[in-house]
Amino acid sequence: MLHQGIILREGHVTRTIYNLIKDKRYEDVIECITSFGEAANTRAGLSTLGHCYYHAQKYEEAATCYEQLCQLAPKEAKYRFYYAQSLYQAGIFADALRVLKQMGDQEDELREQCLQLQSAILYSSEDFAGAQSLLNQRAGGTADTLNDEGCLLFQADQHEAAVQRFQAALQVGGFNPLVAYNVALAHFQKKQRAQALDYTSEIVERGMRNHPELGIGAQMDIPDGGARSVGNPITMAISGITQALNLKAAIEFQDGNEEAARDALLDLPPRAESELDPVTLHNMALTDVEGPVAGLRKLAFLLELGAPSCPKETFANILLICCKNELYETAADILAEHTDLTYKYLSQYLYELLDSLITAQTSAELAEKKLGTLASSLAGKLRSLAAKVQEVRATNEQQALRDALKDYEQALELYLPVVMARAWISWRDDDFVGAEREFHASAEFCSENSIWRLNAGHVLFMQGDKYNEAAAFYEPIVRQHSDDIMSVSAAVLANLCVSYIMTFQNEEAEELMRKVEKAEEMKGNLGKQYHHLCIVNLVVGTLYCAKSNYEFGLSRIAHALESGSGNRLYADTWLHVKHCILGLLTGMAKQNIILPYATVQEVLNFLRFCESYGLFTPANIFSATEQVPEEPLTIGLEARKLRLLLIKLSEYDNF
């Protein structure tokens, strides 16, 4: 018999089947056995099929096989155990528990395994008390028991004790990537990022060494989806690769390194989108380069899957992304449609914060009142915790001091977003003085926080008469990253340059721009593209245009954008250009501005450049809620119109 390239010779069928199983070719075995007809329904056939379905991660099919085996051989306890195990892996917890309870304590050799499986089911069902009760009945000191004890401690937020249990499990049972991942996760929760990354690195290195067939990193080597999918073999599940790289991505994402987070996800074994596990799909949604709409679609899909497939963080993240991208109506609709998830997955704090942001769209006064109440509550808690830190510091009890500082830092993490939300309500109405008041009010707790200082600098900068004060906030950020100035936001560098210029510190501005230019050239030699200098020149040029110095201002803007490939010309940068050009044209139409012939020539040449390189580049930015026209205006078309207007106003009819 020839079956899809597999030769099944008479008398050698069993040997061939077992060789295929040895080579982990479970799908081939399934196809071979199911083609045998009635033989597939024998005890031997069902047993082999159940084993292969389970290891091919087709758990519902495996459960069906073991259910039939339980009927064929009702006295075989192992079949009932495998049946329950398959149901558990398929997420059918209630039926799995029912099967285990029917087994009772009849089989001593399976007692420990049954208790372990029961506690796993209760843990997955979030019945932690029940899981703990069963754990107390199990043999102590084994690697499995120590790991499960660590999981329950982790769930109870006792992360230090959890780390100790997980490490003990590694010592007793040897290296296990899934237990090592648990250690990494506990370190991550303790904000010990370096230790967490050490464990994830070891898991990935061992995975690459032991499982080259998984193609780890292949997506980085063969970009644009060219790498061949490896599917979801059981080796991927037990290698811990998926968990480790997702955790690495989460660490980078929390640190603000979104590109590094995407790279970590690209290191995952290549799979089609339909083959991705829920956690990977969730993290890809958060880092989606196509923008928030594409990410929201992925998260909405996960939300529809429901528990246990949908990661519990999905609900909060879909709401946060909506608010971050000003999709407040969408956020309100999601909250209204999923009231059950609101109580289950949102803390009282997060619900109140999101509710305030949504309320601000219809009543800024009511939103401010809600945020004020929340801020007052958290400020009171911070003062109490600060006093506790001082008390404990006097006792010289180091562990108590660490715990007190941790509590204070956690409360501060909650307070800061509330401060930013209150300042944002004033900011969006261009009430920068009101926003500054919020920063003054919160300085008692937040003045050393880098995010707070950055936004305080922005608020001062926008007032237009506090450039010295703004520079005082921006300068420490730039100094802190003097070894890698490209890691500083281009907006900060641009605002600092403007602050220097507006306070007559032109030499400092020029020096900063030289540093940026030099750093950008060095990074460019390494194959990395940065637009920091472009943005700085754009902002500085816009500033001079606003002061009616169009000759110098437009020369800065042209210098910022004119590059061989035109890759700096896109909707965001074009917005600066056309605002300045329109300002120039308005002044010329009113006969308030007269430009030298040479300057007009330079501006016309620059607009020709924009026309040429922007012929197919969209000229406008559309939000996620706006309807994009079928034939949107391009930069090239707008540049041509502006060039014709400039020709008319300059009376140069020969151009």
From Swiss-Prot:
It comes from the Eukaryota. GO terms for molecular function: intraciliary transport particle B binding. TPR repeats lie at residues 10-43, 44-76, 143-176, 178-210, 385-418, 450-484, 534-567. PROSITE patterns: TPR, TPR_REGION. Keywords: Cell projection, Cilium, Cilium biogenesis/degradation, Repeat, TPR repeat. One of its GO terms (cellular component) is cilium. It is found in: Cell projection, Cilium. Transmembrane segments: none annotated. InterPro entries: TPR-like_helical_dom_sf (IPR011990), TPR_2 (IPR013105), TPR_rpt (IPR019734), TT30 (IPR039941). Its main location: other. Pfam families: TPR_16 (PF13432), TPR_2 (PF07719). GO terms for biological process: cilium assembly; intraciliary transport; protein polyglutamylation. Belongs to the TTC30/dfy-1/fleer family. Required for polyglutamylation of axonemal tubulin in sensory cilia. Plays a role in anterograde intraflagellar transport (IFT), the process by which cilia precursors are transported from the base of the cilium to the site of their incorporation at the tip. This is Tetratricopeptide repeat protein 30 homolog. The lineage of its organism: Eukaryota, Metazoa, Ecdysozoa, Arthropoda, Hexapoda. The gene is Ttc30.
